[in-house]
Amino acid sequence: MVKTDVIPCTKEEMDSLMDTTIGNDFYYMFFLVAKTTGRRIGELYGNQKKKEIGRKIIGKKIEHDENGKEVALAKTRVIYKKIKGEYEGGVQVKDIDFENGLMKVWVLKRRKLVQDETILTKETLQTIKHFIVNNKLKEEDYLFRQKSYRGIQEAVKSFSKKAGIKHKVSIHNFRHYFVTQLKKLGWTNDKIAKLTGHKSVGMISIYDHVVASDIKKDTLEALKDF
């Protein structure tokens, strides 16, 4: 479910937030990617694995037996528990296509990971390359797991305070900012959904208060002033 209580960051606030990360290669890179792709933290870092631990009765359903007689059966829902320290998906160094300016991501849909692609700006590509070289990362290394999942969430709060932002800021603000800025430029929900991996274009309307090649040029042009 998409949260509706996010207080939007203005461009000035987002610029200030980015300025506070200068000198910290990892967080500057992570925030820049999040800001210019609108991707969820789970798609960048990876989603925490879960295991089935049982089922919960949530109601009843009526079915018919072989004689046509109505039978009341329990309607259940699977209960999952997160597995500490284990993640699936997430961007690896080999998922960055420097030649074509694309990045593979794994989107969780109906508990299954589905491969998608997102467009990267020239600045973002250069920043990623700089980080990879400086940290001597290999093809199989996970690009955004140089810090813990929790650590990244806490860092957003810390850097936003240093930037002088008074309202609450979370990692979701980057996705919110990305969508909001594109809508200000007149982008349709359908076009934005192709970039963000939203399940439906209808979900994007909440932000009103495989990459299609036909929008790559438009995307890079729009992101120049992000």
Residue ranges of each PLM-predicted region?
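DNA breakage-rejoining catalytic core of tyrosine-based enzymes
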Residues: 1-15, 111-123, 137-139, 218
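C-terminal secondary-structure termini that scaffold catalytic or DNA-interacting sites
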Residues: 1-5, 65, 73, 222-226
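Basic, Lys/Arg- and aromatic-enriched nucleic-acid-binding interface segment
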Residues: 2, 7, 11-41, 45
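Short alpha-helical segment immediately N-terminal to, or the first helix within
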Residues: 20, 33-34, 181-185, 195
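Conserved tyrosine-mediated DNA breakage-rejoining catalytic core shared by Y-recombinases
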Residues: 46-127
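Active-site/catalytic core of tyrosine-dependent DNA strand-transfer enzymes
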Residues: 121-166
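Short basic/aromatic active-site micro-motif
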Residues: 149, 166-186
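Catalytic-site neighborhood detector that most strongly recognizes the C-terminal catalytic loop/helix
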Residues: 196-221
